[in-house]
Structure formats: C-alpha cells, structure tokens
C-alpha cells in the first residue's frame, strides 16, 4: 500500500498542475474502493483503500485550500459528504442521513467519520472532480467539464478520470473571449 500511497500523491500533484485549483475551489470525489481493490463496484468496500485515498486528498486540501465533497453511492442518491462550513460557504442545503459502507459507500462513510463537522448535501456544482472506479460524478460538476489527462489512469485496479471546469463561452460570431 505504501507504493499506492506514493502513486496517489503523484496523481494528485499532476492533476493540480493541470487543473490549477485555488483556495476555495470545490472538488468532488467519487470513489469505489471495491474497484480499487479489484472487485466489482459496490461489492467489497475497503477501509484500507478509503484511508489511503482520504489521506492523500486531505493533504491535497491542506496544500491547496480546496473544499472536498465525497459522493455517496446510489443508495443515498449520490448525496455528498462535506464539512458544515463548506455547506455554509456555498449555501448548500443539507439533507439527513449518515453514510455507512452498505448505504453510502466505504469512501463516503470513511470521510464522514474523519471530518470535524460532517453533513450531507443533496447536490453541488464543483469546480473539478476525481472519479475512481467509474462512479459517475458528472451530475455534480459545473458546466463546462474539461477532461484532465494525467500519465496514470488507474489507482489499484480502479479506472481513474479527472476533470476541471471552465466558464461557458457565450455569444455569437462577434463574441471575444480574451482581451487583446
């Protein structure tokens, strides 16, 4: 697992180099620890993988100042585990549930227990996202999502995709998008 810990740190560093997240950015994480461990999504949640992934993301948060949002599984309608201060800052209505491994998922459950004042939000519009194990986080990203390609596309046995967002380009043929 020590090798995976370093790989995860490297992946996050490479992601940040391209995504350029700043203090106050909102980052959504969808994660199947089952997939990371080599099993089918939702069948073998792993506390060890949740700990490794959360640890890397927490260090990433400390370096960048981003706010983390961990997507629950479909049994909690893909609600998001966030800090109460994040809900307040982004004016997100909270919903009532406590994620557990079999209803919320191992990752969301672990994150909930690590946070100082965890709450669940029904939905968000994040500035960027990381999807570990094809959990489908697109519903929680701002338009317009832009793929971030890094050199490694797997963590453990899980497929990893990453995205940042950009403002919509509006206007017609006369629109200008950069100052001259």
UniProtKB/Swiss-Prot annotation:
Transmembrane segments: none annotated. SUPFAM superfamilies: TTHA0583/YokD-like. It holds the Pfam family DUF436. Belongs to the UPF0340 family. NCBIfam families: TIGR01440 family protein. This is UPF0340 protein RBAM_034070. It comes from Bacillus velezensis (strain DSM 23117 / BGSC 10A6 / LMG 26770 / FZB42) (Bacillus amyloliquefaciens subsp. plantarum).
């Amino acid at each position: 697992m020590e090798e995976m810990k370093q790989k995860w740190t490297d992946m996050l560093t490479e992601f940040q180099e391209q995504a350029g997240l700043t203090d106050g950015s909102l980052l959504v994480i969808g994660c199947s620890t089952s997939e990371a461990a080599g099993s089918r999504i939702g069948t073998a949640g792993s506390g060890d993988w949740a700990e490794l992934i959360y640890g890397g993301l927490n260090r990433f948060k400390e370096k960048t100042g981003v706010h983390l949002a961990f997507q629950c599984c479909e049994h909690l309608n893909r609600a998001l585990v966030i800090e109460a201060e994040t809900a307040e800052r982004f004016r997100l209505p909270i919903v009532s549930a406590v994620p557990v491994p079999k209803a919320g998922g191992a990752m969301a459950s672990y994150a909930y227990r690590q946070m100082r004042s965890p709450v669940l939000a029904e939905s968000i519009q994040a500035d960027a996202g990381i999807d570990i194990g094809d959990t489908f986080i697109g519903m929680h990203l701002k338009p317009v999502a832009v793929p971030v390609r890094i050199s490694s596309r797997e963590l453990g046995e899980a497929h990893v995709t990453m995205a940042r967002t950009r403002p919509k380009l509006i206007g017609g043929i006369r629109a200008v998008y950069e100052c001259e």
